[in-house]
Every structure is written in C-alpha cells, then in structure tokens.
Amino acid sequence: MKLLNSLILLVLTCLVSSINTQFISIQKYDFSGNCKNSSDSASSFEASSESAAICMQNDLLSGIVTNEGVCLIFNEVPTTFIISTKGDYIVRSIYDINDNNCQGGIIENKAIEIDECFVECADDYHGSTYLFSTETSLNYPSNTFMEISYNGECDGQWKTSFNYLQYYIVNKCNVAHEIETHTFSVGCNSTSSWVSEYAGEVCTVEPTVTTSYPIVDNCGDLDNSNFIDYCNI
C-alpha cells in the first residue's frame, strides 16, 4: 500500500511539474507598422493599432523559445524574461551590455503584453515586429536553423535540460535595425549553416558575401552551458 501511495504521489508530482512548466516564445515578424513620432524610438515598445494584421504567420522571420529567468542576448543586450504572477504579461529585464551573465543588476524592466503584436522602433521608419506568448510545451517551427543552449550531460539530448533556443526561418530575408541596418538570410544542411548578406534592404539580388559555418556541438562553453546547432528541415 505504501508503495502504491508513493507511486501515486510521484505521478501527481510529475503532472503538477508538467502543468506548471511554461516556456516564453518570442516571435519576430517582417516589419509592418509606423514608428513616426514615437517617443524614445530607439528603445521603447510601441503598440501597433493593427495588432491583428501585422503578425501573419507567413511573415515569421525568426524566434526564441526560453525558460524563465535564463540570461540571453536579445536585441544586442543581455536580457532575462519572466512571466508575471498572474500570467497576464511578461517582464523583460535589461542588463548592462557587458554583463553577459545578467548578474550585475537590472538597468530597466519592461512589461510586455502576451499575445499582442507590437513594434519596437529603431527610428521613424524602421523597427522590429514581435509577438510574445507563453507555451506549456516546447514548440518551434519547421524549416529552421536552430541554435540551442542546454545544461547537464553534453550528449545532445537538449530537450531534457533546455535553457533556450533561437531559430531562423531558412531562406527568409531578414532586415535588422537594432543598431544598424543589416540584411541577411540563413540556410543550413546536416553539416553546415550559412549566412548570406545583402546590400540595401532586399534579398532579390546576389548576396555581397556568403559565410559558411560548421554545425556546432560544444560542451561547457559560457558558464558551463552546452551549445548545439540543428538544421530542422
């Protein structure tokens, strides 16, 4: 009887743990919006009045899926994300640009509404379109190149000790405006990934340069985290 009770308790504990586990999904879409006349356009989140129109799945460019509180680089600065106690918004905590472990103290907190498209403005005419959401299971799209951080045994079984992953939709034209305009597309196969860079803000011409990288499978880098690349095609 004691054994049966122990097994029931173990199952219930696993179920509660599974139910309480939430991942934060950050999806970046092709820019669509108006940043003109935004105050503090270099750093503020500007809500779009066309929230239902700008986050179309066909316009998805890249994304991040992360556990709460994990230190990662987001828009060029060290950042952590947590879900509010009531689960109605996500708190983005920004750290000093040189604080790659997010341990030197928070510079700024920003509250981000869940499941609402918004534009983070770079200037009057450029910005990035995002959609933040929460997930109870680990989800990511196909036709992507993925960079994954995980802890524990360095055996490639990253789903059991997952920190975060960043993905890029392959062969999609990305125009980044976080610090300066940078236009690129990403491709991959089982042995390598490559980044093609373009002049201007379109990818319809020949790339100015294409750089290839071997698929990464590193152990114990950056505060004992393991990193692995995955071509999810």
From Swiss-Prot:
Name of a matching Pfam family: CfaA_B_C
Gene Ontology cellular-component terms listed: extracellular region
Alphabetical list of InterPro entries matching this protein: CfaA/B/C
Leader peptide range in chain numbering: 1-21
Key words of the record: Glycoprotein, Secreted, Signal
Subcellular location: Secreted
Glycan attachment residues as annotated in the record: N37, N189
PANTHER family: COUNTING FACTOR-ASSOCIATED PROTEIN A-RELATED (PTHR33714:SF3)
Protein's UniProt name: Counting factor-associated protein A
Organism: Dictyostelium discoideum
Taxonomic lineage of the native organism: Eukaryota, Amoebozoa, Evosea, Eumycetozoa, Dictyostelia
